[in-house]
């Protein structure tokens, strides 16, 4: 139910929403044609490589080679520019736990969260996710971080149900151009 009910009534889907955001973002970045598929293919390989190492991941033990992205019989189009391997499988669940002993304790310096509309018509910009930007500003402010790109050892986890959201998220977090 993340798609606006009125837009859903006209056939809009989450992959369709992400596809439009991705198209706009790639256009803004001046990435066109086969270069878009090349970027998405590399992101797919990265995602599957990481997931293949996690025993709790849907694709545990199943990394994908670059050629798999371009296999038209197994990686069908979903919503341009997204193909099947750009989309996560339907699955639920997430958790984050930090366990440590006192001598090795780490301090979580900042945390931020935000929400925004899923409606394509109500978005201020199509090339970013405002909630990510807002949550990052809150977390950086709470942590006293003025220049996140200059931090060493920064750990970031982004929700990337669609491969194309990773570069968009890194830009929205202020970690990439």
Predicted regions and their residues:
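Generic recognition of stable, solvent-exposed alpha-helical segments in well-folded globular domains
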Residues: 17, 35, 39, 131-135, ...
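Condensing-enzyme catalytic core mediating Claisen C-C bond formation in acyl metabolism
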Residues: 2-8, 28, 33, 41-46, ...
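Glycine-rich, mobile lid/loop segments that gate access to catalytic sites or pores
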Residues: 2-81
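A short beta-alpha structural unit
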Residues: 111-114, 152-163
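Long, hydrophobic N-terminal alpha-helical segment
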Residues: 5, 9-13, 134-152
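Stable alpha-helical structural segments in soluble proteins, enriched in small hydrophobic residues
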Residues: 96, 131, 135-146, 164-173
